[in-house]
Amino acid sequence: MPNLRQMEIVTDVDKLNVDLQATLMKYRTIKQWAYIVHDKDDTRAHYHIYLNFGTSSVNTALVASWFQIPENFINKVKGRKTDMLLYLTHGNDSQRNKHQYDTKEVIANFDFETEITNASIIGDRKSVV
């Protein structure tokens, strides 16, 4: 039950039994969020949900209760925020062999495309999505 400032939720679409949009907007502790449905991979349709709590740390068990999912569906974000955001579209170099999702498929409470473009400009990425 760690406390984290940012985390990722990965869950099959049919396992998420809450209104995702309403849940994301309900908790003001979540400063930034972005999600996508990966439904063109070679696996079952699943969500990748990015959560950022700003300067606060939030317990993963609490977040699991918000989304009514097991806590083990929540992962610590490894690497930089940009790496996590790029993974949503399989934009990382290591994900080039997977389906490339359009940035317009990502739903976020911030300008996702600008965030990715700015990361490219400052050198976090070799090419723009």
Roles of regions detected by a PLM:
Residues 41-48:
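The conserved glycine-aromatic submotif of the RRM
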Residues 1-27, 54-129:
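Catalytic "initiation/cleavage/transfer" segments centered on a nucleophilic residue
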Residues 29-41:
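Short, glycine- and small/hydrophobic-rich beta-strand elements in well-ordered beta-sheets
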Residues 7, 33-34, 47, 72:
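A broad, low-specificity signal marking well-ordered, structured residues that form hydrophobic/aromatic
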Residues 50-52:
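Extracellular, beta-strand-rich glycan-interacting domains
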